[in-house]
Amino acid sequence: MISAALAVLESEEQRNELSEIYENNISNFYNIAFQQLHNKHDAEDTIQEAFLAIAKNPGPFFDVAVNKRISYINVIIRNTAYKMRDKKHKVSENEIVLDDTI
């Protein structure tokens, strides 16, 4: 699921570490995203988007102490889920407004 994100990373060591974190914590990551979005596909998209964001700018993630990296990912997933939820909510509001004008 995060193969696109892993492909962006230049270091094999970073790819292995991020892949291992993903494999060991996917259930937790999914639960965080699903709690906000209540939709399986949106939760999966959120996780992929969060890992891609880390891969595109890996410096801050790999600068964090090893024991805090999962918490770091949790925050990114939660924030990404908030953004997706707000974006979908805004689209829904616009659809309602458009429907009222017809």
Identify the role of each PLM range.
Residues I21-Y22, K40-P60:
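Conserved RNAP core-binding helix
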Residues N74-E95:
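Arg/Lys-rich amphipathic alpha helix in sigma70-family domain 2
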Residues D100-I102:
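Acidic, proline/glycine-rich intrinsically disordered inter-domain spacer in sigma factors
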Residues N31, D45-L52, N67-N79:
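Structural recognition of an alpha-helix C-terminal capping motif at a helix-to-coil junction
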Residues S11, F51-V66, K87-H89:
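Sigma70-family region 2
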Residues M1-N28, Q35, P58-G59:
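N-terminal module of bacterial RNA polymerase sigma factors
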Residues R15, S19, K40-E44, V66, ...:
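Alpha-helix N-cap/helix-initiation sites
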